[in-house]
Amino acid sequence: MDVLEMLRASASGSYNTIFSDAWCQYVSKQITATVYMYCALVMMSLLFIAWFLYFKRMARLRLRDELARSISTATNSSGDLRGLRFRKRDKMLFYGRRMLRKVKNVSGQMYSSGKGYKRRAVMRFARRILQLRRDNMPLEMRTVEPPAEYLEETIEGSDRVPPDALYMLQSIRIFGHFEKPVFLRLCKHTQLLELMAGDYLFKITDPDDSVYIVQSGMINVYISNADGSTLSLKTVRKGESVTSLLSFIDVLSGNPSYYKTVTAKAIEKSVVIRLPMQAFEEVFQDNPDVMIRVIQVIMIRLQRVLFTALRNYLGLNAELVQNHMRYKSVSTMSGPINSQTSQSSRQAPNGPPMVINQLNLMQSAASGTGSGVSVTVTRPPSSPSRHSREEHTLSDPNPNPDGSFHGTTNLFTEVHGDAPNADLFQQQQQPSVGNLSTRRSSITLMTPDGSHSCVQTPGVTTSIDMRLVQSSAVDSLRKELGLSEEDSHIIEPFVELRELEPNVTLITEGNADDVCVWFVMTGTLAVYQSNQDATRAKQDKSDMLIHFVHPGEIVGGLAMLTGEASAYTIRSRSYARIAFIRRAAIYQIMRQRPRIVLDLGNGVVRRLSPLVRQCDYALDWIFLESGRAVYRQDESSDSTYIVLSGRMRSVITHPGGKKEIVGEYGKGDLVGIVEMITETSRTTTVMAVRDSELAKLPEGLFNAIKLRYPIVVTKLISFLSHRFLGSMQTRSGSGAPGAPVEANPVTHKYSTVALVPITDEVPLTPFTYELYHSLCAIGPVLRLTSDVVRKQLGSNIFEAANEYRLTSWLAQQEDRNIITLYQCDSSLSAWTQRCMRQADVILIVGLGDRSHLVGKFEREIDRLAMRTQKELVLLYPEATNAKPANTLSWLNARPWVTKHHHVLCVKRIFTRKSQYRINDLYSRVLLSEPNMHSDFSRLARWLTGNSIGLVLGGGGARGAAHIGMLKAIQEAGIPVDMVGGVSIGALMGALWCSDRNITTVTQKAREWSKKMTKWFLQLLDLTYPITSMFSGREFNKTIHDTFGDVSIEDLWIPYFTLTTDITASCHRIHTNGSLWRYVRSSMSLSGYMPPLCDPKDGHLLLDGGYVNNLPGHLWRYCRASMSIAGVFPPFCDYRDGHLLLDGCYTNNVPADVMHNLGAAHIIAIDVGSQDDTDLTNYGDDLSGWWLLYKKWNPFTSPVKVPDLPDIQSRLAYVSCVRQLEEVKNSDYCEYIRPPIDKYKTLAFGSFDEIRDVGYVFGKNYFENMAKAGRLGRFNQWFNKEPPKRVNHASLNEYTFIDLAQIVCRLPETYAVNTAELFSEDEDCDGYISEPTTLNTDRRRIQVSRAGNSLSFSETEMDSDVELDLKLERKMDKSTQSSPPTSSRTDMRGKEEAKHMANWHWGVKHKDETGSGATVATHTQTGQEQELQQQQKLQQLQQDQGARAEQLVDKDKEEDKENRSSPNNETKN
């Protein structure tokens, strides 16, 4: 609110709302009389009270004298009683009755209307006069400091492991995946090296064949440049290693290398553990699965650590790969070469090789003599220029626009069934051999020295024998895979040939389905990567060229070994012929020859540049458990860290010992980069919130790359600039007193979310499905339960031996999805503990209308994940129209909760159905579009960092425009996730958060505005104007009547209000406490209302608009936000006693505060007044008489000079104006100002008119935004495509591939429990309160559920029958259309498919004793066992089918009896 505007209105006599100008003059003249009158009244009141107390005392004295006289008379009549005394028991009885009698009298006086009534009346009158009334203090939120473990690292060592073994486990990631016997065998080969200062650990020309781990001391690793200078890469300290895992592959593949540029020297006396790489040979011979797993881990490290650090953060792409490799021969044949060579030339860079005349080629092959040559065979283009700019797929006549393939089955067209020697040109969409007869033919020869010889024979008919080409491709791929000639029969059935036209896409980046190993026979392939440079993203969005693949080279080995998606996009650069082997075929070959993984890995390593090898020595792959510190405060900063997975927390320790959260880092963030560049000590301590993986980039390596590749400096400047701009936008307002924990620069975008139920009554599965449904609109999301993981990875996946498989699989799922939901079990199982370790945030789900007590299971969750952020989610049924209440009790009982959410649930969430029914129900729900205005969508946007905030500014009666803008926002389809307000905006925002119904909000706002126009109420509220004109009592009553005793915590939508704390001289943000009080404080305009005294600390709070004009019981903070200085008194906070005034003095549009609280997109509505900036330049001095003359002389030109109140008002709003300009210039806020300047601050009688102005303006504004395409970030930020139906029980489309498990057929012992396959909850179906979950002796089972509902609800019986009929039809169609199972299908997959089929039919197999499902243990070791298992499963299925038929008949008979029994009873 504006003091200047009110004074001007008073001077002009144009108020017409509260008081007139004549009345103001009367008050100014009679001020002395008013003082005397009030003093006389107070003196009379004091005299009356003194007389009353004196009269009571005199009456008590007279009564005492009468009692004394009566006692003395009785004593004289009875004689001398000095020798008598009372017994102790009598004394106790006497005094006890006396005290009880007094207590009874006092308690009776509290409610009686007789004795003491006059005294109570006088005291009430005195309290009213002297304002001695004491408010009933509401329930306060307990401010509990987080536990010490939340901000402290874990400092615990492992005393049971020897130091050398512990350093080996910690330093090199691959050792962590060895089993204990294998690791102990490796330890036998270790050697201890003692080095003095200056001794070389290794130097140039030494063999690179060992792993070095520093046990004590320090080692310096540096590189030698060509000019003789050296540059340090890193300093290796205690527990760290010096090794290159790429050299590890060279040694194992039989191609050991030497140190060419890297040297290691001891800085001080050191002890180093040396482990020869040859020691692994002995282990790998006996354990081929260990070899495959080690190679896979090395390749994953190469892709996730080296490529991630060098590409995404240093801007290096093509520098990582050698682009000029020596051409290899495709095939070597003996025979003379036709000497009719017209010319010999090099192949053109962009032109395809010509076609060879096979007549001469066959003659030379038949002769069997001649020198070795290389023959390249391909087809020339008919018009190269016509095809050079468009992409084609190989099998689809209508290819995708991007040239990508449609899937694995359509990726390549089969040549001719399974025949490997079929004619290549007899495929669809390809020209026949006859088309080649009229074309120009040529021969391209490649000599052993790499030169090309091209012979052109125009007009000669070609006759190509594809069997020769097939044989050449098989021989070349056999050599690339390191197989002998005797192994040709293994690879021959899987080799396929294809001809490519220019710009045909073989695989796209991020595709995991079309991974193959491609061998180029003729032509050239180009390898691309997406442009990751943020600075050039808007200018150049095309893919970046990495390198070319020439004839004789192989590509695709990295994605094949890692089992992950392809990191590159591969296209044909010219007409080319390739030979390839699919992923499934490669894995089948690996089963027979596991050592091909070494040759595939060696092929990948040969392609890498020397820079990658040097970086491999310096970069480290670190795995941290929860609570472990990355670095500590005040340590030297010699490296930076990249978060690959997990979550980190930065904590600063102040000089007094107090610790504070500085920030949190998630996947992809760079930690410690600023300190490393500035060469300053660590300012904070960074620790792992959960199990995390990091890549360590030393300072020496960073400097070496920076000198060699200056583009790194540009990338670094861009990165630091974005971080600096982000910190500048979030700096203001974050450090103010009263700011919550969320105000810290902590990111609110989570990758993993764990869902924990408080009790068994919580419908956790429907809740997870609803949240999953809302998250699917934002991006790819995955829902995981214990049963889903078991079905995918085996029932024994949670055992310690399978730790690597589980963690790798979960990490891969997290990389693929923007968010992963971990649904915990209802007990503290192994899966629940795993969820706690993987979660970035834990959602504790409870029922809002139930008891708030903390259970034992919930306390265990807090103990397991002390450092993980926890948020409370309270569910409310929509049918009961219940509103949140008693939220403070929930939060006070759980001090570890940092945030809470109220979620209104539809009826289907609380349905009492079995797990199968719930899965089937949500399989249909997931096909629909989610409601973006629901509470689940609001929660989904919060978890993914896409929340939409609404900020309402202050402006007095002009705030009625907020109601119209709210209606326009609702009609525009914009969801509101967070609301903040100042002054009148605090009132309107609180109304919306409380009801979320525009009709109800409008009615309440209109009623409050009408109360503000009643003059007689304002006259009764007048007081002596020392602090303010009004006492604020009636104003408080209007706000309290509007909200009642509601707390901010009980609002549906997260809400905050902003006030000006005149006690601490800053603004305060209120996110909890009394609503009406803080709204009143935010409306306390200086001079009209006294500041509100904060009950927390006693600080005086004014209108928050003085510092920020755009931003418990609820009404108190609303009242505090409306404490206009001078009009209403400051409101005293009931928590600390601070005085609160209107928030408009500090920040009238607190959009920056909303941004700090986590809102990504903000709509800010400003209705405040605007100051006149067109003032008169009056020179160096100013005379008041001159101004008076100008004012009263109508013949002179008017001047605009601010008067004293105007100057004071402008000074008060200096901070607010500066803050408003920052909000207008920000990129995260949409600033809107309706045209309401003609309305006065106190024109509350024009509510409907101002509201209509705001509605019309808002409607037109959002329509124009929609036409301009700017409305999408508010109401169309999610994916509008209809969701696709997915199978949530399995993850067949993309899963982690454990080569050791697949290739070596490891014995996997698992339990086939048919009871586990029927539901996702291993404990029970449905709720625990259902009779079926507790009755374990029931032998009868439901088959096809003919006419019966598992929920025992009579109203659902018909729908269940219809659903079963649909399921039966679907099963019949699927069984008829499904192809026969391949012979290479894994046994585990067959079992799951059969049991899942039985599950869909509703069959639960239990033994005759009723003890549950029979558990059979199987072991996969060979083809014989597979056949035996197949026969057993078929027999088991037949037995189940026969038993099912019997049970169906039996159930039908019982159903008929049950249905007929009620009719018989009614007849009887």
Curated annotation (Swiss-Prot):
<dbReference type="GO" id="GO:0034349">
    <property type="term" value="P:glial cell apoptotic process"/>
</dbReference>
<feature type="compositionally biased region" description="Polar residues">
    <location>
        <begin position="332"/>
        <end position="348"/>
    </location>
</feature>
<feature type="active site" description="Proton acceptor">
    <location>
        <position position="1103"/>
    </location>
</feature>
<feature type="short sequence motif" description="GXGXXG">
    <location>
        <begin position="954"/>
        <end position="959"/>
    </location>
</feature>
<dbReference type="GO" id="GO:0046470">
    <property type="term" value="P:phosphatidylcholine metabolic process"/>
</dbReference>
<dbReference type="InterPro" id="IPR002641">
    <property type="entry name" value="PNPLA_dom"/>
</dbReference>
<feature type="transmembrane region" description="Helical">
    <location>
        <begin position="35"/>
        <end position="55"/>
    </location>
</feature>
<dbReference type="InterPro" id="IPR018490">
    <property type="entry name" value="cNMP-bd_dom_sf"/>
</dbReference>
<dbReference type="InterPro" id="IPR056556">
    <property type="entry name" value="NTE1_P-loop_dom"/>
</dbReference>
<dbReference type="GO" id="GO:0072657">
    <property type="term" value="P:protein localization to membrane"/>
</dbReference>
<keyword id="KW-0597">Phosphoprotein</keyword>
<dbReference type="Pfam" id="PF01734">
    <property type="entry name" value="Patatin"/>
</dbReference>
<dbReference type="GO" id="GO:0034236">
    <property type="term" value="F:protein kinase A catalytic subunit binding"/>
</dbReference>
<comment type="function">
    <text>Phospholipase B that deacylates intracellular phosphatidylcholine (PtdCho), generating glycerophosphocholine (GroPtdCho). This deacylation occurs at both sn-2 and sn-1 positions of PtdCho. Its specific chemical modification by certain organophosphorus (OP) compounds leads to distal axonopathy. Plays a role in the signaling mechanism between neurons and glia that regulates glia wrapping during development of the adult brain. Essential for membrane lipid homeostasis and cell survival in both neurons and glia of the adult brain.</text>
</comment>
<protein>
    <recommendedName>
        <fullName>Neuropathy target esterase sws</fullName>
        <ecNumber>3.1.1.5</ecNumber>
    </recommendedName>
</protein>
<dbReference type="InterPro" id="IPR001423">
    <property type="entry name" value="LysoPLipase_patatin_CS"/>
</dbReference>
<feature type="binding site">
    <location>
        <begin position="480"/>
        <end position="607"/>
    </location>
    <ligand>
        <name>a nucleoside 3',5'-cyclic phosphate 2</name>
    </ligand>
</feature>
<keyword id="KW-0256">Endoplasmic reticulum</keyword>
<dbReference type="GO" id="GO:0006643">
    <property type="term" value="P:membrane lipid metabolic process"/>
</dbReference>
<dbReference type="GO" id="GO:0004622">
    <property type="term" value="F:lysophospholipase activity"/>
</dbReference>
<keyword id="KW-0217">Developmental protein</keyword>
<feature type="compositionally biased region" description="Basic and acidic residues">
    <location>
        <begin position="1385"/>
        <end position="1395"/>
    </location>
</feature>
<feature type="binding site">
    <location>
        <begin position="596"/>
        <end position="723"/>
    </location>
    <ligand>
        <name>a nucleoside 3',5'-cyclic phosphate 3</name>
    </ligand>
</feature>
<dbReference type="GO" id="GO:0061024">
    <property type="term" value="P:membrane organization"/>
</dbReference>
<dbReference type="InterPro" id="IPR014710">
    <property type="entry name" value="RmlC-like_jellyroll"/>
</dbReference>
<feature type="compositionally biased region" description="Polar residues">
    <location>
        <begin position="357"/>
        <end position="366"/>
    </location>
</feature>
<feature type="compositionally biased region" description="Low complexity">
    <location>
        <begin position="1419"/>
        <end position="1441"/>
    </location>
</feature>
<dbReference type="Pfam" id="PF00027">
    <property type="entry name" value="cNMP_binding"/>
</dbReference>
<keyword id="KW-0812">Transmembrane</keyword>
<feature type="region of interest" description="Disordered">
    <location>
        <begin position="1368"/>
        <end position="1468"/>
    </location>
</feature>
<dbReference type="GO" id="GO:0051402">
    <property type="term" value="P:neuron apoptotic process"/>
</dbReference>
<comment type="subunit">
    <text>Interacts with Pka-C3; interaction inhibits the catalytic function of Pka-C3 and the esterase activity of sws.</text>
</comment>
<dbReference type="InterPro" id="IPR000595">
    <property type="entry name" value="cNMP-bd_dom"/>
</dbReference>
<dbReference type="Pfam" id="PF24179">
    <property type="entry name" value="NTE_Ploop"/>
</dbReference>
<feature type="modified residue" description="Phosphoserine">
    <location>
        <position position="442"/>
    </location>
</feature>
<feature type="region of interest" description="Disordered">
    <location>
        <begin position="332"/>
        <end position="411"/>
    </location>
</feature>
<feature type="topological domain" description="Lumenal">
    <location>
        <begin position="1"/>
        <end position="34"/>
    </location>
</feature>
<feature type="domain" description="PNPLA">
    <location>
        <begin position="950"/>
        <end position="1116"/>
    </location>
</feature>
<keyword id="KW-1133">Transmembrane helix</keyword>
<dbReference type="GO" id="GO:0007272">
    <property type="term" value="P:ensheathment of neurons"/>
</dbReference>
<dbReference type="GO" id="GO:0005886">
    <property type="term" value="C:plasma membrane"/>
</dbReference>
<dbReference type="GO" id="GO:0016042">
    <property type="term" value="P:lipid catabolic process"/>
</dbReference>
